[in-house]
Amino acid sequence: MALLLALMLGAQSAGYTRPELLVDTAWLAQHLTDANVRIVDLRPRGYGDGHIPEAVWLDNNAIRNAKAAPTFLPTPQEFEALMSKLGISNTTRVIAYDERGGIYAARLWWILNYYGHSNVALLDGGWVKWAAEQRATNNATPAPAATPFKVKAGTVKVATADQVKAAINSSSMKLLDARTQGEIDGKDLRNIKRGGFIESSIPAYWEDTLDPVTKAFKPAAEIAKFYRDKGVGANDNVTVYCQVGMRASHDLFTLALIGHDLTKLANYYGAWEEWGNRDDTPIKTKQ
């Protein structure tokens, strides 16, 4: 309890409903060696050149299986083995970070919550803020002892393509698109067969909730206005999609941060990689 209260202090000043979902750099610098804290570096590159002390590296690709339709999730057994190898137990406080404002870290947050582990936070500002403040780094590779980790029923949900089809133009579900305008317009295909967007989806670019310089999250009032202006109500069921589930996870994390009911948040994890490569999925090409 003392640990949670301490890490909440900085985030509380920004007005977040769930300040425990973020830790700041000052807090982390004081808790690098805490026995029950596991720091996870999710940057695609750079870990070997230097990282936050005590951080273990996780390949973000390991938490999505592109061949596992319709959910695209690693199996419970695969996820248990992955967390165990990182030294994460069911009581571990996980702190995730990357160099892109949480785009990779948020996907770990989402899948941990999906598999029943809610004791996870993002480092606000991530590697960008940590490095800018010239905080300690090293290139040592920790070797944590494997610890038992068991999945259980979580809060957030995964949506399948069939469920998304059913949600098109539905009054019971808000469908958000976390991708760039170029992707939505169908001009930026990113190796996908077809471009465009899902009918009735609302553009909600993931990075618009971040400070453009520090990559830290904007205050709660600004984030709430961002989603309110998109027509997202506090009690709405929300499904978010992007290309491979990362940017969608970031939108979901941000909604959770400002107090949205986690049981009403879903990630279409097949994402545009599935939707745009299928021939039976309806696609719009103009907003």
Where are the model-predicted features located?
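Sec-dependent signal peptide recognition
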Residues: 1-4
